[in-house]
Amino acid sequence: METPDYNTPQGGTPSAGSQRTVVEDDSSLIKAVQKGDVVRVQQLLEKGADANACEDTWGWTPLHNAVQAGRVDIVNLLLSHGADPHRRKKNGATPFIIAGIQGDVKLLEILLSCGADVNECDENGFTAFMEAAERGNAEALRFLFAKGANVNLRRQTTKDKRRLKQGGATALMSAAEKGHLEVLRILLNDMKAEVDARDNMGRNALIRTLLNWDCENVEEITSILIQHGADVNVRGERGKTPLIAAVERKHTGLVQMLLSREGINIDARDNEGKTALLIAVDKQLKEIVQLLLEKGADKCDDLVWIARRNHDYHLVKLLLPYVANPDTDPPAGDWSPHSSRWGTALKSLHSMTRPMIGKLKIFIHDDYKIAGTSEGAVYLGIYDNREVAVKVFRENSPRGCKEVSCLRDCGDHSNLVAFYGREDDKGCLYVCVSLCEWTLEEFLRLPREEPVENGEDKFAHSILLSIFEGVQKLHLHGYSHQDLQPQNILIDSKKAVRLADFDQSIRWMGESQMVRRDLEDLGRLVLYVVMKGEIPFETLKTQNDEVLLTMSPDEETKDLIHCLFSPGENVKNCLVDLLGHPFFWTWENRYRTLRNVGNESDIKVRKCKSDLLRLLQHQTLEPPRSFDQWTSKIDKNVMDEMNHFYEKRKKNPYQDTVGDLLKFIRNIGEHINEEKKRGMKEILGDPSRYFQETFPDLVIYIYKKLKETEYRKHFPQPPPRLSVPEAVGPGGIQS
């Protein structure tokens, strides 16, 4: 709808003189608003000045100016004369966003009533909520949250800026960087803001805070973010970690705080190859050096030489007890690799004289080759005195760039290969990552004890749980692997499962198809692992989804694969949900879930019209189940004894309903260990195994019926950070 022209006389076009008057009145209106002269504003509006006039440079309208000045009276006056509350400045800011900057709740309320969108943003992605957080306006923040503001919205900026990895910050990041403690606590405690959200550079609120030297209250803010679970190994500009940033700040308290966190990577290197300890020595920070040494920081750099170069005798004296030989490299005999498979070759490489490529010693020879790749190969290497696998790419290789970008952005994670550094030399890129012992394909071929114990395949569950966790981590950082296969899943010397080979990975911006590819590959990997690699993965890739589902050995595996093949709309969070799938439950947990549901009062008293029994009822069009006539499948002596309890009390015996079956399982669990039930226990054996084998589709049936209801409270909940259970096999699988 066009804005009416209040300055055009009836009956024809305006004269040149009247046009000059209009322009002058428009300019005067803006100046009157800026001065807060409400009388003059009213006079000009009544005279016909344009309420939507804007100055040429930045596009400020009278309404923008009135909101900035906090003049409710002038705002109302302008709105009554046709001022457009949706008009944007040249940077896309609306009057509503300006009100967020000012933290004026009254003006926010007025503009919302005029149709403003609570989540509208300018060209840099700033919303009123983000502006309130950035400026510490707690009252405005609470008001906007109550009106539906998106707490975790990321700044959506222009395509050109996204290419430069700009934008993507959240309100929490702004509040943390600016040192607004009250707003930070409100966002985390009351509004449940995502503490580890990442911007387009992969930075979270913690690293943005530590790298901003102007941030106030930095120690308290860091403590709050860490307590709420912020990733302490995240990387920021130039590959800096929070620990490195704290050392560069020369802030001993921050260093102590970070070193106290479990999982801190004390030896992480920035893009220049510097560790926190090296920086502390170079900056002559004796107290921080002491802290890092006591925490076991790696002493592989020329630390004593650096201290001597700086003529810091006290620091030299501090370092000497921690450095085995400050003047020479350790002899080959004193260097022992962790790898058993590659140990002999690594010792040979360590002892030979080779020209160093930066911090890397490598010999491009078949004796030290791990595997071939599409562009080159993977070789053994020693990087900074650490055994590594080195992927060799052509210089400026798109695949190599993808590999480095993904590894850096995703940071350290126990289910991804660790990234130690890169070197460039003579047209080649050398990417150094953690060295592993086997591919998944090789590992499944190793001789081991029978992995399936009493029908429960803990071995497969352990491996797949690690793989799922690694892929989930990848997706949370905005990457899709695109090449999940047994050759790209590795097992290290500690039997930990690690995802590798990210040279085909894609940075996705919400395109679900990228993630669907990973989920489909995961579905095939589930079947591959469960079947112990008996069917080659390439063969599984040629089979359609329906054929693969029919190959599943049990209902839990079948449903898990189906969920991966058909994730629905919630593609991004699919793996988060599936980590709680019955496939990953132990048999004891499955049995406990059935007992707990059976312990619901509606089931115990057979309340036929209850919501729970209605949910559990078998629908007419559903396929037949193993438990449809369940009373006939229970051992007759056990069934008779359990029914006898009700017959004595002249109550109905157990019926062929799901509710009664759950009630039966509950009662068995409550009484089977009683002395008088010894005979029953001898017949049933382990109840968890008995019911799983007798009714193999019962657990998945209950799960699918109740997973979207309040009764999911009976399901075992995965811990915040899933750890992989001990597996049978050569040494077990670790997380």
Curated annotation (Swiss-Prot):
GO terms of molecular function? ATP binding; endonuclease activity; protein kinase activity; ribonucleoprotein complex binding; RNA binding; RNA nuclease activity; zinc ion binding
Which GO CC annotations does the UniProt entry carry? mitochondrion
Named cofactor requirement(s): Mn(2+); Mg(2+)
Q: Which SMART domains match?
A: ANK, PUG
Q: Which UniProt keywords apply?
A: ANK repeat, Antiviral defense, ATP-binding, Cytoplasm, Endonuclease, Hydrolase, Metal-binding, Mitochondrion, Nuclease, Nucleotide-binding, Repeat, RNA-binding, Zinc, Zinc-finger
Subcellular localization, per the record? Answer: Cytoplasm; Mitochondrion
Note on how the cofactor is bound: Manganese or magnesium. Required for optimal RNA cleavage rates.
Q: Which positions fall inside the Protein kinase domain?
A: 364-584
| Renumbered zinc finger spans (C6-type) | 401-436
- Stored SUPFAM superfamilies: Ankyrin repeat, Protein kinase-like (PK-like)
Renumbered to this chain, region (2-5A binding (P-loop) 1) spans 229-242
ANK repeat boundaries on the chain: 24-53, 58-87, 91-120, 124-153, 167-197, 201-234, 238-268, 272-301, 303-328
Chain segments carrying region Binding to TMEV Leader protein = 26-51
What triggers its expression? By interferons. Virus replication in higher vertebrates is restrained by IFNs that cause cells to transcribe genes encoding antiviral proteins, such as 2'-5' oligoadenylate synthetases (OASs). oligoadenylate synthetase is stimulated by dsRNA to produce 5'-phosphorylated, 2'-5'-linked oligoadenylates (2-5A), whose function is to activate RNASEL.
Give any Pfam family that matches: Ank_2
Class in the EC hierarchy, top level: hydrolase
Instruction: Give the residue ranges for region: Disordered.
Output: 1-21, 714-735
Region annotation 2-5A binding (P-loop) 2: where it falls in the sequence: 253-275
The record comments on the domains as follows: The nine ankyrin repeats also called 2-5A sensor constitute the N-terminus 2-5A binding domain.
The role this protein plays is: Endoribonuclease that functions in the interferon (IFN) antiviral response. In INF treated and virus infected cells, RNASEL probably mediates its antiviral effects through a combination of direct cleavage of single-stranded viral RNAs, inhibition of protein synthesis through the degradation of rRNA, induction of apoptosis, and induction of other antiviral genes. RNASEL mediated apoptosis is the result of a JNK-dependent stress-response pathway leading to cytochrome c release from mitochondria and caspase-dependent apoptosis.
Assembly and partners are described as:
(Microbial infection) Interacts (via N-terminus) with TMEV leader protein; this interaction prevents RNASEL activation by its substrate 2'-5' oligoadenylates. Monomer (inactive form) or homodimer. Interacts with ABCE1; this interaction inhibits the RNASEL.
Q: What does the sequence similarity comment in the record state about its family?
A: Belongs to the protein kinase superfamily.
Matching PANTHER family: 2-5A-DEPENDENT RIBONUCLEASE (PTHR24141:SF1)
The identity of this protein, by name, is 2-5A-dependent ribonuclease
Instruction: Report the source organism.
Output: Mus musculus
Identify the coding gene: Rnasel
